[in-house]
């Protein structure tokens, strides 16, 4: 039993015990019989309820319905495994943040963020994070509990995450930044090209069409290509590992690496737009590990959401 289930089980038992005390103190002749019924029937029911999947599915359904009814800015993240999606989320929300719900394929996070510090206006944000390597995990397994039911999607911002170096594990743990930099400093251009090719295989026009058909509605207001791990790129450039590229031209070099993906996303995005519905597209370079540029990509969508006077909870 999880900690949450144990807590609820204990609360149910306490409530039952309070009922026993109240019945016993009432002085009613039927009191002993009612207490016996509680002991024989209610406690086993509580035990079964606290450990049965059906019971918890019912609770989860109530919670999910409430989640969809609650106004929020909703983000949908798409990218290869190891590209930094979860790190990006935790960089913005805080490293200790935990998902509201997590499965083998999917997790989502919720938080409250300030729209502006002067008025103290805040809004709720919901961020979906899909695990693993298969694109189907992002599309076929898309949770209507978070992004809304088909035909009534609630997604406001879509992030396509790419990076210049994969996640590499050694002895069952991912390399830290220093170790990854050491690995990338040898045959740098070849390794970067290989990683870009992996993203090109993952973010293809056919998949993009499915992604947009999965998340699209008039609630979608922004699409962003997020180029992650720019800090690593700056460091290998400073080390002279990429001939002809200087620190002043790092951003341009990174944009050129993913120019084809940028074009594919723009084209897919244009196919779902209409004269009365414009989706803003941008390309942003970030470092999820040190936070560079991370707040901007989320805050731009939140500001656009607010400026368009969409329904938002103001506190």
Residues of each region from the PLM?
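Short, flexible boundary segments at extreme N-termini or domain junctions of P-loop NTPases and their
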Residues: 2-75, 284
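Short hydrophobic beta-strand that contains or immediately precedes a catalytic carboxylate
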Residues: 77, 125-129
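Short acidic, S/G/P-rich loop/turn micro-motifs used as interaction or catalytic elements
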Residues: 83-84, 133-135, 164-169, 231-234, ...
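Short, conserved catalytic or adaptor-binding loops enriched in Gly and charged residues
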Residues: 116-118, 267-278
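Conserved C-terminal guanine-recognition region of P-loop GTPase G domains, centered on the G4
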Residues: 146-153, 157-272
